[in-house]
């Protein structure tokens, strides 16, 4: 298993309960596919560097996980499909 950092931006118009459900759903996608979530950070609502789909703000989430490639690929696939996630990125952390 390798260490990854995942950052995704949730559409700002999503209600708080739906937002929590979305975060739990994507955390479940990772854990159900064998990943271990080390740390979760909610950066909250922040201004975007540039407009995405005519939106100027987004709710940022950052996850640090130990995972295999299958869990990361499934997360990536579902994040691309979901309309409430504006952008996401998965970065593999370097071995020290």
From Swiss-Prot:
Paired cysteines (S-S): none
Keywords assigned: Ribonucleoprotein, Ribosomal protein, RNA-binding, rRNA-binding
GO cellular component, one term: cytoplasm
Protein name as it appears in the record: Small ribosomal subunit protein bS6
Any single biological process term in GO: translation
Gene from which the chain derives: rpsF
Top-level taxon in the UniProt lineage: Bacteria
Organism: Bacillus cereus (strain G9842)
Function noted in UniProt: Binds together with bS18 to 16S ribosomal RNA.
Family: Belongs to the bacterial ribosomal protein bS6 family.
GO MF terms held by the record: small ribosomal subunit rRNA binding; structural constituent of ribosome
CDD domains for the chain: bS6
Pfam families linked: Ribosomal_S6
